[in-house]
């Protein structure tokens, strides 16, 4: 083993500088933070050659006392803390006392500063960490510091610097973050003698956003806030139309400090997930004000990361604030259309016997897969029963003797499906013989559920709570104009034109219904009379094995059927009559693409795929009753405004919008 050497001060300072000072923008960041801590209200940053040749910071802060000028450049010399305990209640940008020592050790640094109580200031010049002179000088109150020839004495670091244009861009970015974090401070960035960025310190965050970005972004913002005992979360999030394909327009500030945090970003994006298209990222500026003792800012050399005491609570606070703000904004946009006062939602207690014709012993609901009628698209058959999912969930139709007692039915109706609910056994106390005998299947031309029977003796004492949604005054002033291209539904209401994407709207309805069933454990399945056998590759089979619980919880009954082969026996009822193999493989491929993501994200996308594949498609002709049913289903959703993939379900044109298009008004 080699001999252990004690490094000299110059070497240790250069090594320390390598951690704190990565590039010229790091110098700007550290020096501007010092100016902010000094209470400056006007800060000017001048750079040349991307900061490699010159960085000059001028502020009107409190300044440095003459006696402290030399000490300011010593390692770990700071006015911010006195002991280790102070780190955990720090409220300033800087606290380590490393910045000036690190910067001066790898550059030529000149500093002039004056406090208000002195008639003159002090000037110090340091080259490569060595003080060349210290003298009195005349200057304004505040501090001016010039850093030139950065890394001139560290050739190895110098040759790894990026181009001047790249460094200029990085400096512009960090200055923009300062403008957002401190709307009450005026910042002025001058690059090669020309003004590059200018803010006016109005104290208005929207003014800062407009300065940093543009008018379009500043006019498409949604305000959000959530205040708790120890934390306040507030800021702006952009409307979906200003989302981008990257996260460059996202800013997080914790106690005014610009940081990067994956879990905070995830909280905002998850709250925005259902409102954005795939692979789009929202614009946001989020501020988190929290008591210093609940965070640790001393976890990264550049202080660009923070650690929270309770990340779970933080995630929920951020998610709730953003999600409620977005929902509120969308609701306001469609207030006239989604007027909840027009919908009378009431609870009624009805016995099953009152809902279903009594007198028979059979319970049977087969579906003809060969039928071309869209009987299950909007529940025109099934939903004649109030909330039939709630009804069916209490009926276990999957008894072994269903098929055993009716061999003729099994052989003659290969394209029919049975409904089953695997999660609820409320009728187990009844005698199975009372409801498991099958007399005759429903005929293919049946248009309702009148042949769904229960023995009267078994149902007289049974009742369930049924929640119905009855239109009250909604259709009074609504006019269904029709379909455009059998894809878009046109509706007139209160002198406004609404255009609904029928696929996106129905997809959202199915998604919410299916998601609710999974969350409550009420997934109703259909028994396939002809099980679907699928051969998978080894990779596909492994993906299925890793995620088979997702399929099970979603209403699929899948069994291994030999090596790399599966047998699908049941699919979710809500899907109607899907192409089982295509649907299964689509979900499998999505799971493969998302294998590194959170379980909740995988489940969300799996449900979205199910809904997308089962929804009415573009170019499907809909009857007026089907359109009305779709609108009714949308009305009871918390968020009917976007499909699961983030596309809008509808757009609105006011009379004023149309008259502007036709130049009737200006």
UniProtKB/Swiss-Prot annotation:
PROSITE patterns: DNA_MISMATCH_REPAIR_1. Gene3D superfamilies: 3.30.230.10, Histidine kinase-like ATPase, C-terminal domain, MutL, C-terminal domain, dimerisation subdomain, MutL, C-terminal domain, regulatory subdomain. GO terms for molecular function: ATP binding; ATP hydrolysis activity; ATP-dependent DNA damage sensor activity; mismatched DNA binding. One of its GO terms (cellular component) is mismatch repair complex. Keywords: DNA damage, DNA repair. InterPro entries: DNA_mismatch_repair_CS, DNA_mismatch_repair_MutL, DNA_mismatch_S5_2-like, HATPase_C_sf, MutL/Mlh/PMS, MutL/Mlh/Pms-like, MutL_C, MutL_C_dimsub. Pfam families: DNA_mis_repair, HATPase_c_3, MutL_C. One of its GO terms (biological process) is mismatch repair. SUPFAM superfamilies: ATPase domain of HSP90 chaperone/DNA topoisomerase II/histidine kinase (SSF55874), DNA mismatch repair protein MutL (SSF118116), Ribosomal protein S5 domain 2-like (SSF54211). Belongs to the DNA mismatch repair MutL/HexB family. PANTHER family: DNA MISMATCH REPAIR PROTEIN MLH, PMS, MUTL, DNA MISMATCH REPAIR PROTEIN MLH1. This protein is involved in the repair of mismatches in DNA. It is required for dam-dependent methyl-directed DNA mismatch repair. May act as a 'molecular matchmaker', a protein that promotes the formation of a stable complex between two or more DNA-binding proteins in an ATP-dependent manner without itself being part of a final effector complex. This is DNA mismatch repair protein MutL. It comes from Clostridium botulinum (strain 657 / Type Ba4).
